[in-house]
Amino acid sequence: MVASRAGLTGNQVVVQQVERSTDATAAGSTDGTSMSVQQIASVASPSVVAITTEQMSSSQTWFGGYYVQSGAGSGVIISQDGYILTCAHVVNGATSVKVQLNGSDESYDATVVGQDSTSDIAVLKIDATGLTPAVIGDSDALAVGEVAVAVGNPLGTLSNT
């Protein structure tokens, strides 16, 4: 399979191809061609992260301060050295972005490397190594009608939904 490591610069997407030596059998398939939803979730879960954000509101409080708005979302690790793919709407306008790895109570400060609101994609970077990147398939190899499974963390609680 081929995984992509994406970096965004303004509205331009830069993709580096990273060769992965994982096949369906090695990932837990019983027939060598497909995996159950449970198997997919088991393989993907270590790569799913919780993202929390804070943004200063443009509205002032009664006493002259500013409101802090909180947000939460999901991301997926795309490289061992801390690059994470998420949706741009999760981090757009955030003054603080934190990432929590699956199975860990520790959170990392994240830097938004780039984002594109038109395609709703963003790349974050955390200072960590030895991470488990997701195995990203080739969408050109799919046929109309094949099952697709989305594994994520939409509420920011790592509930493995």
Residue ranges and their predicted role:
Residues 1-161:
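Serine-dependent protease modules
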